[in-house]
């Protein structure tokens, strides 16, 4: 039996890299520039096929708007965001950034991409939690 190999889109790769960098930023509190540089150096081969301008925009703009993003998320979380798994928090922050500021990206795409990224990086059931939270946030941002 042959396995179907899925080609990952450059934007999905950008989101995955942005989540990894947001996670590093939240854990280390190093500067975004330092995190990005170290990531690119460490992941040189993995950066092929990444929409680099979109990756940089997602990573830096999510950090620039983190207070707004966190206050947008807070009413829809079942716990404080500091109690969230750091990967779940990074995925949610990125998705809320896209829902709130990247209006050219359909909300269904944002939610689906967040779920798919959670399946790669999150805990076993985290994609379900991410989906539930984003399904509540999207209508509140008039994205449904």
Swiss-Prot record:
Gene Ontology cellular component list: cytosol
InterPro entries in UniProt: NusB-like_sf, NusB_fam, NusB_RsmB_TIM44
GO terms under biological process: DNA-templated transcription termination; transcription antitermination
Gene Ontology MF, one: RNA binding
Matches recorded under Pfam families: NusB
Swiss-Prot/TrEMBL keywords: RNA-binding, Transcription, Transcription antitermination, Transcription regulation
Family annotation (CDD domains): Terminator_NusB
Stated role: Involved in transcription antitermination. Required for transcription of ribosomal RNA (rRNA) genes. Binds specifically to the boxA antiterminator sequence of the ribosomal RNA (rrn) operons.
Entry's family note: Belongs to the NusB family.
Protein name in UniProt: Transcription antitermination protein NusB
Taxonomic source organism: Histophilus somni (strain 2336) (Haemophilus somnus)
